[in-house]
Amino acid sequence: MAENLVNAFVTLVIENSDYEELDRIYLTNKVFALVGEGVADVETESSELIDLKDQLLQAGVKAGSVGELNEEQDIIGAQLMDLITPSPSAVNRNFWDTYKSNPEQAIADFYVQSKRNDYVKVKAIAQNIAYKAPTKYGDLEITINLSKPEKDPKAIAAAKNAVASDYPKCQLCMENEGYLGRINHPARSNHRVIRFQMEGNDWGFQYSPYAYFNEHSIFFYGKHEPMHISPLTFGRLLSIVEAFPGYFAGSNADLPIVGGSILTHEHYQGGRHTFPMEVAGIKEKVSFDGYSDVETGIVNWPMSVLRLRSEDKERLIALATKILNCWRGYSDEKAGVLAQSDGHPHHTITPIARRKDGKFELDLVLRDNQTSEEHPDGIYHPHKDVQHIKKENIGLIEVMGLAILPPRLKTELKDVEDYLLGQGNQVAPIHQEWADELKAQNPNVTAEEVTEVVRQSVADIFARVLEDAGVYKTNSEGLDQFKAFVDFVNLAD
């Protein structure tokens, strides 16, 4: 049954906040201030808060009181959803009051709030294409990321002409909490951060708006300081998995090519998700002198990973620190491993922490950011022949076996499917060689089979991408070279 749109929205705001019926006129005027009084007579049949918010924005655009750009609508939409969001102090008080008796419930409540107020973009995330496919390294996870709207040319032009601002300094800074937003910086009116302390310093815990996996979280330093992998990193990650039950925590590497997209602000990522790398077994056990109490092994994975397990956090931190320091100074010409050139360091680690079965676990992924004439984008980076699927940096999430692929692939892969079925010749030039190979391998593919054929091939290519990013190859020679590094660590003081 249809009812007034503004009235329906205000009713749900009252039901989902500390506002009361007496506040209805006040809230109605708040809504009019944001989307304009031209929406006053619009009706709706929806009963979902986020749908009503979207309808208010659309009605405002139609009435001319809300801008047409996604960025303009996001700014107003975040303010509308801020009406159901408690103040930062209330959010933190509720979190830590609940945490005292039930940490899992405190985390769950904050996650529910972050979805309810549309900070975590549940509707947008649902647009992503996601599937699993078997490979020789186990099932890999493939996602085509469609949740973030493409930049409108008008928005790009507007951002170019926008007044420069360095507030907030980046999208991870604490100052984003409640920030209105602008054409070139996301709206954050409905953003809330849980404060916590590590080593006597302020840190923040939030969810990622465009999550790549379940309860995708960000843990960020209170100060705007660059990413740096150090002994402190290992301790912090282990502290996080201890404080946030059921979550993993990991850090992107701190060097270009092998690092993530944000190197300017110290932060880690985590969440409640079991990645393919976590379930990968140990390819070969190794031992480190003086650490017989720590379980150690080389993981059966396309990238070069050492797994350490112990009940004692301090022992893990000590061994991980030794491995990091040795890796930063280690070169092996025959293996193509070089610690530095012209004063530029090439070696770092992508670390991942977990707590399982009463033990702490650290995966240390060895990274090398060398380039060469043959591989100008990176020797240990997706090579040219697989860049038609993935050419971006291999960061923390992909290291663990979840591919984040660009939106262009949605239509490009459909064109490849049509090509295999003989229903079209419009294949993007970057895919032509691959499409021809698939056609030769699957001459009689049917319409029922073709999507699976293409998806499986994409997963196989992603496995190759990870192999390219691996410093030591997965053959016997690569294993021997990896073990030579382990020997080097054992010889170090």
Swiss-Prot record:
Q: Which GO terms describe its cellular component?
A: cytoplasm
GO molecular function, a single term: UDP-glucose:hexose-1-phosphate uridylyltransferase activity
Q: Tell me where in or outside the cell this protein is found.
A: Cytoplasm
Name the chemical reaction catalysed here: alpha-D-galactose 1-phosphate + UDP-alpha-D-glucose = alpha-D-glucose 1-phosphate + UDP-alpha-D-galactose
What biological-process terms (Gene Ontology) are attached?
Answer: galactose metabolic process
Which PROSITE patterns does its entry note?
Answer: GAL_P_UDP_TRANSF_II (PS01163)
Q: What is its EC number?
A: 2.7.7.12
Signal peptide: which range, if any?
A: none
Q: Which UniProt keywords apply?
A: Carbohydrate metabolism, Cytoplasm, Galactose metabolism, Nucleotidyltransferase, Transferase
Top enzyme class: transferase
User: Part of which pathway?
Assistant: Carbohydrate metabolism; galactose metabolism
Q: Family assignment?
A: Belongs to the galactose-1-phosphate uridylyltransferase type 2 family.
The protein's name = Galactose-1-phosphate uridylyltransferase
Q: Which organism is it from?
A: Streptococcus salivarius
Ranked from the top, the taxonomy reads: Bacteria, Bacillati, Bacillota, Bacilli, Lactobacillales
Write the gene name.
galT
